[in-house]
From Swiss-Prot:
UniProt-recorded name of the protein: Triosephosphate isomerase
Species per Swiss-Prot/TrEMBL record: Caldivirga maquilingensis (strain ATCC 700844 / DSM 13496 / JCM 10307 / IC-167)
InterPro entries, sorted: Aldolase_TIM, TIM_sf, Triosephosphate_isomerase, Triosephosphate_isomerase_arc
Assembly and interaction partners: Homotetramer; dimer of dimers.
Family the entry assigns: Belongs to the triosephosphate isomerase family.
Main location: cytoplasm
Positions annotated as active site in the UniProt record: 93 (electrophile), 141 (proton acceptor)
Subcellular location: Cytoplasm
Amino acid sequence: MKVPVLIINMKAYPELLGGGAVKLAQVAEKVANNLGASIIVAPPHTYLRQVAESVNIPVYAQSADPVDPGARTGHIPLEFIKDAGASGVIINHSEHRLLLNDIAMLVNKAKALNLETVVCSPDPLSSAAAAALAPTAVAMEPPELIGTGKSVSRTKPDVVVETVNAVKRVNGDVKVITGAGIEDYNDVAKAIELGTVGVLVASAIVKAKDWEAKITELAKPLVGK
């Protein structure tokens, strides 16, 4: 994972239907190339292969199930995510929570498959626990702020700093990013100022009227513009 980074979690918004997921990924790639910024996109599973074949920027899955391939109706093992072209996976988002042993299983298997991992956590203590598993990155997102427009970096800056320090104490190789309520340039700039190396953003981008303008706005602080 190249940092500083902007990770776009597309979630399952209706804007992605009918080719929207591919279009958004292509816009993200255009901005990444224009600014020289690191941008990762995470489309719904149903569009993973289509998006991965349409862009050269990293594509992550939004989640995975802690199971091996086999008689697993409705489950999505990591092997299938990798086969679809993803280079990483988001684990334990607040909208798709897992038990600690399941998180550990996914992180370990992802390493064996050469997939990057971003483990989401709600607070500094959970972030430290996640860091002990040695994922690629930990993304601290207070669930009460997700989708509110009240950014974690400006609403709870002390929690962001505490998370950065907690993760460093456990494993200095684990990258720390943050998310929840990230809406504009200042939110991202503040997150970087507080010691993180990136942000995880969803609705602010997917629901924006002008995807290119919004992604550009949020990516500029990552490259010092």
